[in-house]
């Protein structure tokens, strides 16, 4: 029987890929590598800097858009993002639909001094230790992909390794689950991973229900400064931008434009 949703299909492939990697590098080996890695950077401090932060993403493809960009040198792209003023660099490592890899994560980590987010579909504890072993400071956890008890344990394990979890939601119900699990950083994805449909009003509906102590990140749909300002007005602390940057002719300048808008005195400030 074929998977029921787009997310189910992605997760099926991820589980197979994780099993293959674990057959090559055991859980005990990846745990040892994680323990030996340099300590993670302070993601919360980066996200609490004044203004609307920009999380700039290294992303080659997506299930909705297909191939986006040929990124021959992810390290160079990450450096451009950092030079443009990005707070965090996100690296998509899922290989089947997004054409990412852990090699991309390694290259980016070695090239920038700001925090790095591993963006993938985390379904096994192995992937958490793997992220830390490859230098991630932050890790994506998708509520729709995890049962509640698993979400809680994954969040606890992520934080026990010193990383910050970006807990992704798409509905008010998922946001409630994220809060009950103890999420400190919640990302609202305008794209429904079940269908790939986009609801651009999603963030504005969900953000007001989140406590002021929670960092709120808007994901998907940022094509320029107008979108950043709209998300800021709805209460975003930061925006995560991928497609709009990798398809731009000058990613450093594209990030710099967003950063300038997000730190301008006229930019709406999140209520705290």
UniProtKB/Swiss-Prot annotation:
CDD domains: IGPS
One function term, GO molecular function aspect: phosphoribosylanthranilate isomerase activity
SUPFAM superfamilies, alphabetized: Ribulose-phoshate binding barrel
Recorded catalytic activity of this chain's protein: 1-(2-carboxyphenylamino)-1-deoxy-D-ribulose 5-phosphate + H(+) = (1S,2R)-1-C-(indol-3-yl)glycerol 3-phosphate + CO2 + H2O
Family indicated by similarity: Belongs to the TrpC family.
Note: Was identified as a high-confidence drug target.
NCBIfam families: PRK00278.1-1 (NF001369), PRK00278.2-4 (NF001377)
Protein known as: Indole-3-glycerol phosphate synthase
Organism of derivation: Mycobacterium tuberculosis (strain ATCC 25618 / H37Rv)
Gene: trpC
């Amino acid at each position: 029987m074929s998977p029921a949703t787009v997310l189910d299909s992605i997760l099926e492939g991820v589980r197979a890929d994780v099993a293959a990697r674990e057959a090559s590098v055991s859980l005990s080996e990846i745990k040892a590598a994680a323990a030996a890695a340099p300590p993670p950077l302070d993601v919360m401090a980066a996200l609490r800097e004044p203004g609307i932060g920009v999380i700039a993403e290294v992303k080659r493809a997506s299930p909705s858009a297909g191939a986006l960009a040929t990124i021959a040198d992810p390290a160079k792209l990450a450096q451009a993002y950092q030079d443009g003023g990005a707070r965090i660099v996100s690296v998509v490592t899922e290989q089947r639909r997004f054409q990412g890899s852990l090699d991309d994560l390694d290259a980016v980590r070695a090239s920038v001094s700001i925090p790095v987010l591993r963006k993938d579909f985390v379904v096994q504890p192995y992937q958490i230790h793997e992220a830390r072993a490859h230098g991630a400071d932050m890790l994506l956890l998708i509520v729709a992909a995890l049962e509640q008890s698993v979400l809680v344990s994954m969040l606890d394990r992520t934080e026990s390794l010193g990383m910050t979890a970006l807990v992704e939601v798409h509905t008010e119900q998922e946001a409630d689950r994220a809060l009950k699990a103890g999420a400190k950083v919640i990302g609202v994805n305008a794209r429904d991973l079940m269908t790939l449909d986009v609801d651009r009003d999603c963030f504005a509906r969900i953000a007001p229900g989140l406590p002021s102590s929670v960092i709120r990140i808007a994901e998907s749909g940022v094509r320029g400064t107008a979108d950043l300002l709209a998300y800021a007005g709805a209460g975003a602390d930061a925006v995560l931008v991928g497609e709009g940057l990798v398809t731009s002719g000058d990613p450093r300048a594209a990030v710099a434009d967003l950063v300038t808008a997000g730190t301008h005195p006229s930019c709406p400030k999140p209520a705290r």
